Amino acid sequence: MKKEEKRSTYIFNAFYDLLIDNYRQQHEIGWYAEKLCLTPKYFSGVIRQITGKSAAQWINEILILHAKRLLYTRFDMNVQQIAYELGFKGSANFCRFFKDQTGLRPSEYRKGQTT
């Protein structure tokens, strides 16, 4: 493996570790780039080059995965509580994000999982 490939792999692995630990609070690419001491542009380019997906796609996919898990398993939590658990400022922002990503409102997704 070439030096640049090793560096890119290291950057992705460090990003993924940060993402798993911080996805609830941090949704911005700039935050992850700063933690890795990289410019957002360079950071985004490395992530896309090594994975074929943008850093934003990775962040969104992790958020959606965990949102679906909470909607499916935590019936004691309403949509607003799930929104706050995932770091959204309000349920409207979360609902818009969820629908943009999945095509369904969170309540529709939850209802579809229980029928």
Named regions from a protein language model:
Residues 43, 93-94, 98:
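Short hydrophobic/aromatic patch on the recognition helix
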Residues 1-2, 38:
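An amphipathic alpha-helical interaction segment
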Residues 1, 15-28, 47, 51, ...:
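Basic, amphipathic alpha-helical hairpins
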Residues 96-115:
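…primarily DNA-binding HTH/wHTH and HhH modules…
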Residues 50-89, 111-115:
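Terminal helix-turn-helix DNA-binding modules in bacterial transcription factors
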Residues 30, 41, 77-81, 91-92:
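Residues within helix-turn-helix
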Residues 4-15, 51, 59-63:
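N-terminal positioning helix adjacent to the helix-turn-helix/winged-helix DNA-binding module
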Residues 36, 86-87, 98:
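Core residues of bacterial helix-turn-helix
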